[in-house]
């Protein structure tokens, strides 16, 4: 059909309208129109109908944990260990924490000291239809006094790059289950999907930082940052990159290599994931008022 006509029991006007991409257990796009009454009723009030319950997701949320670097790419080096060793140990600890709750399915991009291409890491999450992607890393710097964790989400420039990368494929619209009849409409729907994903990523970043701070884990002063990192480019999977601390700082390296400290850190990350999935869907669709801070 090309049009829909509604007969309203009261005079009204459109207050706002917007498009919701697939998510929260709903596989199709939804066009939402909010109406505001103009005054008194012009006829008998319409019978009140209870809204149908939202479709419930049958499966547990799938969290993909990405242990940064690996194999021929050891990442940054500390006094005792390499970044790839630290990230794999943290990924395995986080997997154990999440599986212990019984509320999640968990998938690792690597489980051993192997090299995995950056774009393959993203493909693993997309192919599995992940609900959340978290990439674990350890920062490095020339000043050994600098320490603290930070969380990265996709920048606006990175979002543009993501769209360009994604639309190189001839059948990109099929990957997002778009109609494929009108390229301009599909592009709008892709942009809407990307925006919703960015909003969800920002929501998780804020929640995660709140839980890290509550656990007394040291944070950088500007702890929420943005960048066009390759592992954040999926247009339809909320994603963050967590720099757990500076491997070049003796105190941070100790926290990252001590088993008890690592388990405590991953428990706070798991708590953040728990809270993220408890947040109402409407909040996740709303753009953050607290955007990522710039670089120091």
Predicted features along the sequence, with ranges:
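Short glycine-rich His-centered loop
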Residues: 61-80
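Intrinsic disorder/low-complexity detector
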Residues: 26, 36, 75, 184, ...
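Intrinsically disordered, low-complexity segments enriched in small/polar residues
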Residues: 9, 21, 73, 289-292
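Signal-peptide-cleaved, periplasmic/extracellular N-terminal interaction regions immediately downstream
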Residues: 1-63
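Intrinsically disordered, low-complexity acidic/polar segments
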Residues: 13-17, 40-42, 74, 143, ...
């Amino acid at each position: 059909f090309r049009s829909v006509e509604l007969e309203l029991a009261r005079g009204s006007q459109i207050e706002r309208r917007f498009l919701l991409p697939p998510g929260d257990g709903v596989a199709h796009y939804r066009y939402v129109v909010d109406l505001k009454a103009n005054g008194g009723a012009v006829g008998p009030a319409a019978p009140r109908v209870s809204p149908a319950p939202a479709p419930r997701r049958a499966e547990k949320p799938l969290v993909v944990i990405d242990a940064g670097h690996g194999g021929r790419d050891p990442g940054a080096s500390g006094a005792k260990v390499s970044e790839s060793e630290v990230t794999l140990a943290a990924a395995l600890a986080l997997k154990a924490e999440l599986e212990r709750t019984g509320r999640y399915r968990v998938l690792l991009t690597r489980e051993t000291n192997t090299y995995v291409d950056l774009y393959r890491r993203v493909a693993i999450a997309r192919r599995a239809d992940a609900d959340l992607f978290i990439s674990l890393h350890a920062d490095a710097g020339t000043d050994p006094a600098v320490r603290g964790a930070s969380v990265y989400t996709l920048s606006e420039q990175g979002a543009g790059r993501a769209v360009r990368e994604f639309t190189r494929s001839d059948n990109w619209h099929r990957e997002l289950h778009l109609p494929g009849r009108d390229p301009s409409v599909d592009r709008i729907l892709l942009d809407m999907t990307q925006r919703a994903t960015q909003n969800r990523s920002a929501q998780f970043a804020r929640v995660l930082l709140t839980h890290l701070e509550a656990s007394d884990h040291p944070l950088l002063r500007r702890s929420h940052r943005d960048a066009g990192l390759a592992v954040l480019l999926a247009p339809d999977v909320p994603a963050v990159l967590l720099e757990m601390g500076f491997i070049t700082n003796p105190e941070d390296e100790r926290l990252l290599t001590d088993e008890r400290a690592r388990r405590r850190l991953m428990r706070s990350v798991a708590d953040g994931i728990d809270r993220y999935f408890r947040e109402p869907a409407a909040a996740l669709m709303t753009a953050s008022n607290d955007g990522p801070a710039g670089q120091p």
